[in-house]
Amino acid sequence: MDLKELIAASSLNLTDIQVSQADKYLNQILKWNKTRNLVSRNLRKNDLAEHFLDCAVLQKHLMPGSVIDLGTGSGFPGICLGIIDPKRELTLVDSNRKKTSFLIHIKNELGLNSVSKKNCLLYTTDSADDK
């Protein structure tokens, strides 16, 4: 099934604009993936559409407030949540500059004003809490 069919078969109530944003997002992943290795090269658009829907289901289970997507990669689930709930504040974190450059592009392309990105490496340090 393609994205529109998957959304129609689901319980999601997305506007035409949100469906268009989701479709553009998936197309941009495939386009950028040719040079930036965002996702597996074996993934097709219908695979990404299913992944989008899997991420969309999270929305129902989130409490109100901001969300941090650690190791976001190509933006799953952060960008998906930004499309579905454009008022929710989202911070996408990844250490790979190729991926964060894609995130900047897609945020601007889709007009996701509540989404911000961080390019950093997360690590743990010794602390009293760890002992």
Explain the meaning of each model-derived region:
Residues E5-P64, E109-L110:
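Class I SAM-dependent transferase core
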Residues G65-G73:
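Conserved class I S-adenosyl-L-methionine
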Residues S74-P86:
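Conserved SAM-binding loop of SAM-dependent methyltransferases across substrates and taxa
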Residues E89-D94:
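Conserved SAM-binding motif I beta-strand of class I
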Residues K99-S101:
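Short alpha-helix immediately C-terminal to the canonical SAM-binding loop
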Residues I104-S114:
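Short, conserved SAM-binding/catalytic segment
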Residues L112-L122:
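Conserved SAM-binding strand-loop segment of SAM-dependent methyltransferases
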Residues Y123-K131:
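Single conserved hydrophobic/aromatic residue that forms the stacking wall/gate
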